[in-house]
Amino acid sequence: MTLERDAAANTAKVLSEALPYIRRYVGKTLVIKYGGNAMESEELKTGFARDIVLMKAVGINPVVVHGGGPQIGDLLKRLSIESHFVDGMRVTDAATMDVVEMVLGGQVNKSIVNLINRHGGSAIGLTGKDAGLIRAKKLTVTRQTPEMTQPEIIDIGHVGEVVGINTELLNLLVKGNFIPVIAPIGVGENGESYNINADLVAGKVAEALKAEKLMLLTNIAGLMDKSGTVLTGLSTQQVDDLIADGTIYGGMLPKIRCALEAVQGGVGSSLIIDGRVPNAILLEIFTDTGVGTLISNRKRP
């Protein structure tokens, strides 16, 4: 009986601690980039869906943007289509773009929507082609070595960058009590499809909606200093300094730049969160300490 009482007391404590945070975020929009291990473990997938439904139930407006790189790679392999990468970006020819649309706009998107709906939510799956949600243009990639007099332009196919976001559609869905789930496929001015990095799409969606938070789920505990210690709170200036001194480098750099630009573009804060931790989103927004790394020019509440 004591164990049951202790468990009940812990639950009551958590709910009591969460109350001021729920009040703070009621009516606010949070954009969550969903990817990595959180999309692979059945337990974590279920937990993510329940967390999103809970957020909506208490009056917070979650908007989900998802990735799907491993799933794209798996189908390309099964179809004997070779994958090539330039600076971490998948070279996307016409055949690869067809697969990207099938996987992101079909398999992955609808599985997330279905999971959220099974747990009591009202999710709607979208790609950037729906009502021109994500307007895009072809991404230009250049490379230059000391021996070159001019930079080399590298064609990586149907890889795009965001030009604009249809906020009218998203606001309409949010006001209708729906949870938008967005696949990062953009549409060009002539109707062409573009494969866009999900972190970048999430950042631009957060900026366009003037979201309270941008939350990027990752496979790491947060942004770390050179000694391996997680940095829990950083200003935009501190992030710039860490980029300049080489603390932030490699594959983490694009993600951090995306988080940084979102804050500079009007988002309240950006967070790098360990998606391997069960209920990581709720731990961040509903507890006193939070988890991961917060980037903001405000103090952590």
Swiss-Prot record:
It comes from the Bacteria. It is an enzyme of class 2 (transferase). Its main location: cytoplasm. The record marks 33, 255 as: Transition state stabilizer. It catalyses: N-acetyl-L-glutamate + ATP = N-acetyl-L-glutamyl 5-phosphate + ADP. Keywords: Amino-acid biosynthesis, Arginine biosynthesis, ATP-binding, Cytoplasm, Kinase, Nucleotide-binding, Transferase. Catalyzes the ATP-dependent phosphorylation of N-acetyl-L-glutamate. This is Acetylglutamate kinase. It comes from Pseudomonas fluorescens (strain Pf0-1).
